[in-house]
Amino acid sequence: MSSALKELFPTVKRRPRTLHVERGERTSASFLRVLSSKDKARGIAKRLPEAFVHFGSGTIKNYEHLRRAVSYIARNGNITLEKADKSLLAGKADYDSELYKWKLSQTIPDQGGSLSHARRLILSMPAGTPEDKFKNACRKWANDTLSGYEFVLGFHTASTDQKTNQPHCHIIVSTIGKDGKRMHIDNQTRDAMREHFVACLKDFGIEATATRRWSRGKVLKGIPISEIHNERKFASSQERAKAHAIARKKERLRAKDKQIQSVISAFKEGRNIADTPGITKIKKNREKLLQLVGKAIAELEQSGNSEDLKIAAGLKDYYKTLGPVESLSQRTLRELRETQRNNQKQADHIRRMQAMKKRKNGLER
């Protein structure tokens, strides 16, 4: 296989499907299914959606935190949860009873605590993904990767939650296995678990891929999932959580106001916003990326294989459409200037039409 393609889309080392399989018991079926470099290139070429797997921090350290975290994904009992054995928890009484069993089996303290007893995971796909197929893929992924641990699933979809149109699955999983061992997921295992989710989606007819942001040429990050869901509100008492959320909001507003002022100032003065050291570094990385892409495409084309030629053509098309490397402030300034130019063109067009109308009226007289 192309060495450039491997560098562009590195493969993940195989990892055990579960975290409690002894070496002597491992077979090919005991490992997570990962993507090859060509699988990832094909996904980019076909512009398949990226499978999203978020591993939350292990901040659930006592029974109070656990109940509140599960209540959140259950929308206070309005969304039915599912257990690892596929049985349902249809309301607060059901999941409170289940969580009390966790408390007794793991000796979870009522309050306080210094060790993690559970963590949050989120699986997600773009709007329009078939809900039933998505749910089945999530169930399979959870059973494949989290067997040996207690967990509950909560599905937030357009049909169950008015607040979302993007299907996602919340998972609260115990961090203490049935054998008493504590969960540990390193970065390689996280990548392998994400790619296994792609395989599970494919099992139910949903095409997706899992690649690095750098390989895709993505620059601006979206709003962190921790900001969207404010996960830390579960890590302390209600009053402390409220104060924390307010402080974080004020901090974001101050930063946003500073960005807005810098954009307005640059727009009025007709100057550009200088690159930050981070943007300068990203531009250099973009150059390296495009050089590597060029080599990978050339190697695919040289193979003469019809499938490789399709992938090469798709990669060319994808990387041609990458947006410029710029900060959020720089992008806002560029869009403002584009809007100004478009408005000017529209105003010029209106003036020309009015002038033509006047000339026409003059001739008719």
Set out the residue ranges of the language-model regions:
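N-terminal nicking endonuclease/strand-transfer module with a His-rich metal-binding environment
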Residues: 1-365
